[in-house]
From Swiss-Prot:
Top-level taxon: Archaea
Name listed for the protein in its UniProt record: UPF0254 protein MmarC7_0182
Recorded family membership: Belongs to the UPF0254 family.
Family matches, as Pfam families: HcgF (PF06787)
Classification via InterPro entries: HcgF
Amino acid sequence: MISVATAECFTHGKIGVKIHKMACGYKEVEKDPNYSIINGNVFVMASMFLPSKKGIESLLDVKLPEPDYVFKYSKAYTQENDILVAKIVANALKNKLNCDIAISSTAGIGNGAICILTDKKEYNFTSEVYGDLIKGENILKRQENGINKAFDTVIEILKKEYGLK
């Protein structure tokens, strides 16, 4: 079985939950065309929504850069720093849980960033939707796009790296 763990911010843990539902055989997702790739082959070790710097640092034993923006209790970075933070968090998650696939997401001002780390490769990408956490612009559209793009990337990884069909 392939182990997956997520530490998510702007995707609110929904990447991990979607994978978990398929892995566990929830009826509501049986008709998804990728159901058979995940069900019986993958399990989710952890799916975490971690919006705060302190939460990430405490749970994953990692130091993050100071946020670029002040936003309530959440961290908010520039696009450039979102990419850096997503990589840091995915690496810390993989090291902490020793999972096969670690997924991390973060977004402040910009398109956000997602890092998927496997034993073979690091995949870094953004959503296709610009959003601004501080102003509350396009947050849900960016989230939905990020979840879908990350899930599609996980499916491609399972096919290419693990030979699942």
